[in-house]
Amino acid sequence: MLFPLTIDLPHGTAPDASHPLYDAAVTTRGLCPSCGREHTLPAGVARAECASLMRLLEQHGRIDMQAPDDAADPHFSLDYLHGVARGQMFGVLVVRTQDGSYGTLRAFSAQYNRVWHVAGWVPPLIDIAAFDAQVAKDDPVINALGRRIRELDATIAAERDAAEQTPQAISDTTAPVVTADTGPMSVDEAPAPTRIDLLMRERAALVDERKGLSQRSMRAIHELYRVHSFGNRTDRADRAASLFEIFPAGRGVPTGTGDCCAPKLLQYAILHNMTPLGLAEFYWGRESRSGARRHGEFYPSCQDKCYPILGYMLCGLEERAVTG
């Protein structure tokens, strides 16, 4: 998981501000909800290490670069990023280990072609087994509701087409939906305007049900994320926080929170007692739909999903850097 530095590092020197490839630009930042301060991490020599990673990606044409060519998995081909799926973010974190040596960690954002774990890349923050169990529990119900809604859409459209073809018959219809003698009518028994109204009500109820279930499922998934902090490790408390503890009260947790490169890289460093020295992220593959991400370009950590998390994670890093 830890790779050696590819940049030239003369004996007795460090990949710090004295190195000619050092970039002082702040690429990773966040506001800590615990101490109320913004914490940052510069690119350092991570951009130079990213350039080396880009060359490796071009050379191998796949992300499972540790596998021999005859054992390469087509699932991990970079062709995936140049097709319908479009590109993806990759990141490199330069670290100092407990024994004083230096190395790099690598990450890709979220999943790669629906796979969370790939050899040579840091793991996700989420418990995958628990995630799979939650998805297996909720998705079939959510999908079934979606199918029923689509069926109702088709039925409603057909009813409206039929109604437009027989306007006189509809205008002459005065039968009530409920009578004292017969009770509630079924959808099939009701006149056309009433049938459409009943179908629309059923559809609205199903939409609300699906929305509620989707929200509960997403909250349950977000509860599976546990975020560590350099401060907690330094204080030997090692207590992980949930996403709901980190994000401001009343603010929803955006979809995909915790899956970006920076949180994955920092989490691995925290859990393995490594000290970050620089972090950089770049986009690889087909341009994003919005045009905001372009192949081979560097981008800072995102504001919406990462800013609160990174502030919490980086809190305490300054003290660790001072104490070595």
Model-identified regions with their sequence ranges:
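Catalytic cores of nucleic-acid editing and processing enzymes
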Residues: M1-G324
